[in-house]
């Protein structure tokens, strides 16, 4: 083999190795950068949180942003977890400690607890309504918003019954059922062959009965009754859609009339949103 050819092959191999190293560095990081980020994270804790029991749980590389993320925890604070981001050179980028101070960690904990509570019904295999399809939507949430959202004149999706974020106390153990009674919100999409106000009333009463029997309170319900999708995943446009139907209004006498009014109010709400676009 001629010398120029050997040199060309060698250059090609070196270039290929360089590309593989670069690709591996981008996808998985490297030990040197990991060590730099780990050292920087320890220095960050020493500088910012000296005298506390905060500790670094782990540090991982994210190929999505090409940075290292140190996850910080406290054994005495259920809402104290946050993360710190570092570059591959160990330079500080940002941290999420504000989510501890402003109450979002507490809000997420409470919402997760309420979600788990409602999932005991909505994810139960014995549930008489199908919640196993990829397009199925059935869950419960706590409505929690910051003061700025309540005061924003352009905010259209903040319910009056929502909990004020600033009222939450860090690390406080709340009665989730009591919060659910004040701000629990069920979002239910039910597939049914028959789309009618009567079927809507029957199914809403059924859900109220299930939640009452399980002693899982909620304050309001979003309810959509629609046809099942075809085998190819297509659906038609016929549906009944209701937003924020209150728990206290889900009782048999006059329910159909209240549903009719709620359907009109929901349609008007979406028409208003369309005009705002």
Label the model's feature ranges:
Residues 80-101:
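A short, surface-exposed beta-strand/turn
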Residues 95-195:
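Non-cytosolic head/periplasmic domains of membrane-anchored proteins
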Residues 6-25:
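Hydrophobic membrane-insertion alpha-helices, especially the h-region
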Residues 47, 51-62, 123-142, 214-230:
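Short glycine-rich, low-complexity/disordered patches
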Residues 27-57, 109-123, 202-212:
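Short, non-transmembrane alpha-helical segments in secretory-pathway proteins
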Residues 1-5:
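Short, Lys/Arg-rich N-terminal segment immediately upstream of the first membrane anchor
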């Amino acid at each position: 083999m001629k010398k120029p050819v050997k040199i060309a092959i060698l250059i090609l191999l070196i270039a290929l190795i360089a590309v593989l190293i670069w690709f591996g560095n981008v996808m998985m990081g490297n030990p040197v950068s990991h060590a730099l980020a780990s050292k920087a994270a320890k220095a960050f804790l020493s500088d910012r949180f000296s005298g506390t029991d905060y500790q670094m749980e782990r540090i991982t590389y994210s190929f999505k942003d090409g940075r290292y993320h140190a996850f910080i925890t406290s054994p005495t604070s259920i809402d104290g977890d946050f993360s710190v981001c570092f570059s591959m050179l160990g330079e500080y980028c940002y941290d999420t400690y504000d989510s501890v101070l402003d109450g979002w960690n507490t809000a997420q904990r409470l919402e997760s607890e309420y979600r788990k509570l409602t999932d005991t019904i909505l994810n139960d295999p014995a549930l008489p309504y199908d919640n196993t399809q990829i397009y199925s939507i059935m869950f419960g949430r706590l409505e929690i918003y910051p003061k700025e959202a309540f005061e924003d004149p352009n905010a259209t999706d903040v319910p009056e019954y929502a909990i004020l974020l600033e009222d939450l106390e860090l690390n406080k153990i709340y009665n989730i059922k009591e919060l659910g009674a004040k701000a629990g919100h069920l979002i239910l999409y039910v597939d049914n062959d028959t789309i009618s106000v009567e079927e809507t009333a029957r199914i809403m009463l059924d859900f109220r009965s299930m939640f009452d029997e399980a002693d899982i309170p909620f304050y309001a319900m979003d309810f959509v009754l629609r046809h099942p999708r075809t085998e190819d995943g297509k659906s038609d446009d016929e549906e009944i859609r209701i937003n924020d139907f209150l728990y206290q209004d889900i009782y048999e006498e006059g329910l159909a009339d209240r549903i009719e009014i709620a359907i009109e109010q929901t349609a008007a709400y979406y028409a208003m949103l369309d005009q705002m676009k």
